[in-house]
Amino acid sequence: MKHQFSALEARVIGCMLEKQVTTPEQYPLSVNGVVTACNQKTNREPVMNLSEAQVQETLDQLVKRHYLRTVSGFGNRVTKYEQRFCNSEFGDLKFSPAEVALVTTLLLRGAQTPGELRSRAARMHEFSDTAALESALETLATREDGPFVTRLPREPGKRESRYMHLFCGEPDTATLAASNETAGVDTDALTARVEALELEVAELRERLESLLGHLGE
């Protein structure tokens, strides 16, 4: 596939696509806007902490490669950027709204199951059911000008296979599996911590009620 990006380029493109749909009133984006979008703590995997210089360098590279263009003119005191990656007037890459939502979510969060994709892509496109989403994934995986996504081998103990975009090359399945396993462990630890805190709060509430009861006697 001719459309290949570095990890930072993929993050910037994903942010551009996301903001174009979800916050059109703030689009095109300034450099600061792109930095903020790239470093979001939510809906990003991995969470990044990019500097303005890193983002500016990435923007410049994408402009040179004709995946972005600068927007400046009357009323614009700062340079802003908009994507030419897909569905642009002069570009040859065309995606449906469903495909844009899936590609964007994969660019921003990496490998995911159909269930995860349906939930996380809902702000950009509402899929009627999982079958409709899987149909769109299959189209992305088999298009003549692609493939753009691939289905990863199902991991032991998992019910669903995950899908990954191919805009950064063939995925390293071993690394992705290890990352997913670590994420699962982190989630389990967080759940246990929350349950422990809830129990502690309940005990403190009982003590407080008992103390108030004694004071009222």
Swiss-Prot record:
Which InterPro entries does the UniProt entry name for this protein?
DUF480, WH-like_DNA-bd_sf, WH_DNA-bd_sf
Q: Superkingdom of this entry's organism?
A: Bacteria
Pfam short name (any one): DUF480
What family does this belong to?
Belongs to the UPF0502 family.
Q: What is this protein called?
A: UPF0502 protein ESA_02280
